[in-house]
Amino acid sequence: VEMAAQAAEARGLKSALISVGGNLRAIGTKPDGSQWSGGVENPWNASDVYTASSSYVSGVNMSDMALVTSGNYQRYYVVDGVRYHHLIDPDTLWPARYFDSVSVLSPDSGAADCLTTGLFCMSLEDGQKLIESLDGVEALWCTTDGQLVTSSGWSSHEKK
C-alpha cells in the first residue's frame, strides 16, 4: 500500500484514498481540502468478512496518513469449537490472545502494518511504551475484555 501511494505521489497525484483490506492510506486531503475519513471496525460486533459492517469503535480524520488494523475477527478457522486466528505470538507459537484488534495511525502504511502485528503480540504496557516512543504514530487497542485503550495522541485524530 505504501509503495502504491509513493508511486502515485511520484507521478503527481495530490489527492487520493487507497483502501486495501485493513489498510487505508490517505494522500493529501480531499479535493475540497477537507480530511479523509477512516474507521476502526468494532471487533466485538464484526460482520462476516464478506458482508459490509457499519459498526465502528472509532472514526478518524486523516491526511498524508495511514490507518491500519490487525484483528482476530475476520481471518480465522474453528477446530472443535476453538477459534484460531492468523496473528501468531512468536513466544508461544499460538494465536496471540492479548487483543481483539489493534489499529495504528502513521505517515507510513508499511510501518503501520508492521506495528499492528507486533503490537497485537505484546502486552498493552509494552505496546504503549513503544508507540509513545515513536513520533507521529498513534494506536488504538481493543482488548479481549471489551475495553478501548488509545495512545496519548489518538484523540487528536478522532472525528468529532
Regions found by a protein language model. Give the residues of each.
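Mature catalytic core of soluble alpha/beta enzymes
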Residues: 1-160
